[in-house]
């Protein structure tokens, strides 16, 4: 138990922030996983989930939930995978 009111308040804030960050990270992981799964399927249909994942990564990074460099790294890898999938689809169609 906290000995000071300020310590008690910090504890309440920690609990609130932890819960918020946990929810954001969980949603983020789900969104990125959906994007990666979509990339294994039809490339034309995978652009929307990748865009949603990029948006979620940007939101999480701007709020400080995840580091900005981690968001950038994951976005880069998703974009590269999307590009490879679209190139593979174009060469297969030719």
From Swiss-Prot:
Q: Which family does it belong to?
A: Belongs to the bacterial ribosomal protein bS20 family.
Name any Gene Ontology BP term.
translation
Keyword entries, A-Z:
Ribonucleoprotein, Ribosomal protein, RNA-binding, rRNA-binding
Kindly give the Pfam families that the UniProt entry links to this protein.
Answer: Ribosomal_S20p
Q: Which domain of life is it from?
A: Bacteria
Q: What does this protein do?
A: Binds directly to 16S ribosomal RNA.
InterPro entries in alphabetical order: Ribosomal_bS20 (IPR002583), Ribosomal_bS20_sf (IPR036510)
Does this entry carry the keyword Zinc?
no
Q: Where is this region: Disordered?
A: 1-20
One term of GO molecular function = structural constituent of ribosome
List compositional bias (Basic residues) regions by residue number.
11-20
Q: Which GO terms describe its cellular component?
A: small ribosomal subunit
Mind telling me what this protein is named? Small ribosomal subunit protein bS20
Which HAMAP family does its entry note?
Answer: Ribosomal_bS20
Start-end of Basic and acidic residues biased regions? 1-10
